[in-house]
């Protein structure tokens, strides 16, 4: 039995919570992980948008925060090495998976329901992608780790998230 050993009532009571609210688009949740794919069909409507960068000039830091074209967040790994901030996809999509748990759009007939994904009317929490991990093939003789990130990347991500309105940071980190 898949439920053997599970404590009765140990769920999150999502149904009861959704009777009060299913999300709030004024709340920004930073996903500090690998990339959150901003075009994912179950996440796109709930992605945080840096309006100054979205409507600004490509290749320019339109909002003056030190990061160029950070429309949905920043790739802190790339920034550390080459100064660019473009979000890049990974093989595992862990950040996208985590973001779906938080705020996949509810009631849209796609995928699953996020805990704070809203009612399907654009009222879910906003997801900010703070990419702090990247994937290095295990065959790489220098690193032999997967995924990889640095304390510097994480610290920059927390600072960026706080400076740009995130009230919550999700850090689904671990190691073997």
Task: State what each model feature region is.
Residues 5-11, 93:
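Alpha-helix-centered segments that form part of catalytic cores
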Residues 2-7, 31, 72, 174:
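Extended interaction regions within the primary functional domain
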Residues 1-4, 15-18, 159:
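Primarily auto-inhibitory N-terminal propeptides
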Residues 154:
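Aromatic/hydrophobic pocket-lining residues that form the small-molecule binding cavity
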């Amino acid at each position: 039995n898949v439920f053997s050993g599970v404590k009765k009532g140990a769920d999150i009571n999502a149904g009861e919570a959704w009777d009060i609210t299913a999300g709030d688009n004024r709340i920004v949740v930073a996903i500090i992980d690998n990339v959150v794919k901003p075009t994912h069909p179950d996440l796109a409507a709930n992605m945080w948008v840096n309006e100054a960068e979205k409507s600004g000039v490509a290749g320019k830091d339109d909002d003056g925060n030190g990061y160029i074209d950070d429309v949905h967040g920043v790739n802190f790994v790339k920034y550390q090495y080459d100064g660019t901030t473009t979000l890049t996809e990974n093989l595992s999509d862990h950040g996208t998976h985590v973001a779906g748990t938080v705020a996949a759009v509810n009631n849209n007939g796609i995928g699953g329901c996020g805990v704070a994904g809203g009612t399907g009317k654009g009222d879910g929490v906003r997801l900010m992608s703070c990419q702090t991990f990247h994937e290095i093939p295990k065959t790489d003789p220098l690193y032999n780790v997967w995924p990889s990130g640095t304390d510097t990347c994480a610290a920059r991500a927390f600072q960026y998230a706080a400076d740009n309105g995130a009230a919550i940071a999700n850090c689904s980190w671990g190691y073997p």
